[in-house]
Amino acid sequence: MNAIIFCLLFTTVTATYEVFGKGIEHRNEHLIINQLDIIPVESTPTPNRASRVQKRLCGRRLILFMLATCGECDTDSSEDLSHICCIKQCDVQDIIRVCCPNSFRK
C-alpha cells in the first residue's frame, strides 16, 4: 500500500515538473525574444537612391546651369561640355574653365 502511494506521488511530482518545467523554459525563451524586440538596433540609415546617384547635368539642366554660371558660353576650347558634365560629374569650376575662362580670372 505504501509502495503504491509512493509510486503515485513520485509519478505526480515527475509529471508536474515535466509540464511546468518546460513551460517555464518556454516562457523564458519568449521573454528573451521579447526583450530583443524592445532593444533598438542601432545602425546607420540607408541613403535613398537620389543621394547615392552622382549628380550629373545633361540637356536642359546643363544649359540652365551654364547660363546661370556664365551667361553665354564663349568657348575656344575643343572640350565638349556635354561630355564632361553628362558622362562624368562636373562642377562650377569645370563649366567656368570650358565656357567662360576669361570672365572669372583668379
From Swiss-Prot:
Keyword Hydrolase in annotation: no
Major place of residence: secreted
Gene3D superfamilies: Insulin-like
GO biological process terms, semicolon-separated: negative regulation of dauer entry
Disulfide bond residue pairs: C58-C86, C70-C99, C73-C100, C85-C90
Keyword set includes Cytoplasm: no
Leader sequence residues: 1-15
Top-level taxon: Eukaryota
GO cellular component: a single term: extracellular region
Example of a GO MF term: hormone activity
Matching InterPro entries: Insulin-like_regulatory, Insulin-like_sf, Insulin_CS, Nem_insulin-like_b-type
Residues that make up the propeptide removed upon maturation: 16-56
Places the protein is found: Secreted
Keywords attached to this entry: Cleavage on pair of basic residues, Disulfide bond, Secreted, Signal
Protein family: Belongs to the insulin family.
Name of this protein: Probable insulin-like peptide beta-type 2
Source organism: Caenorhabditis elegans
